[in-house]
Amino acid sequence: MGASASGPECSGDEPSRPINVKVNHFFHDPTLSSYTSTENIPWEGNERMILDAWVRPPFKSLKDVLAPTPGARPSVKRSPLVSGYERPQSMVQKSVDLFLQEMDEAGVDKGILVGRQAGHRVVSNDDIAELRDQYPQRFPLSIAGINGADVPAALREVERTITKMGFNGIAVDPGWWVPAMYVDDPRIYPIYAKCQEHGVVMYLTCSLMQGPDISYAEPWRIQRVANDFPSLQIVVVHGAFPYTSEMIGVMIANAPLGNLWVLPDFFQSIPGFPGAQDWVEAANHYLGDRILYASSYPVRPLKQSLLEFQRFSYKPDVLENLLSKNAANLFRMKV
């Protein structure tokens, strides 16, 4: 298992072959970033491969990832975040075998395991590595969760997970740390610098839920980090909702650097959610090589998420990019 963003090599039954993906010329300038072209990435014979860029199967410490915050107000049925939610049996029974079965039923070929260490929400990176190693064909990529509230400890964990455990990236939730931090807080910068040094991907979670108030999702702060660390590939998880238009603007402004990606996940796939169609228009016209598909399981079920995502009117080549090829490009995968 490789320890950089180049990702692992996973053998398949069919020989790999080069593909040429249509990349919007607004972003396509190989002199600016090694991530701006998806040409000649070895790919399996299955053109319709689906890679879910954010999953947390029910395995050991991942089983409790949705545990409620102590002292938090109870969830309410009228919340759009639970609109039409179909609780998957794999989550009910806490079964990895059922999760793999649900992957097959949904047509999801591979998933990226994503950790989290924020407040009481702690997923063991050792558990993620164990699950990844048990099912390397299903989970070829892994992202380690890091708690930046203790920077020296966080830097040690970055070093351990990347250099010794073969993780492909780091996930941070600054708004959920104790104390909460904005993404451009200077205290976090050593973590960004360490990730940039190792050439791994940064999953940066920003939305109305991550932080004491929605100011913790402000896209201009994300833009500042991207500018300050131009070689750090940053995936904005949840798309900085509710600042959808502003986030799209930041993505456009980031074109010369080409180091920002976005993962709108359930904030887009929930039917009728505000701003969802904006991502479709952006993908179809100028961000088709910058958006990743993810269910964010267990927040939304695998099959339900995919069906809700596919109901949008994406151009066929754009849909293919979002469902797998953009993630392959980001991680420079050989699958």
Where are each of the predicted segments found?
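Catalytic pocket-lining loop regions of alpha/beta-barrel enzymes
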Residues: 27, 165-169, 174-292
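Short, well-structured secondary-structure segments
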Residues: 100-102, 107-123, 127-131, 136-146
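Active-site-adjacent beta->alpha loops and helix N-cap segments on the catalytic face
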Residues: 122-126, 153, 180-188
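Polybasic, low-complexity intrinsically disordered segments
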Residues: 2-23
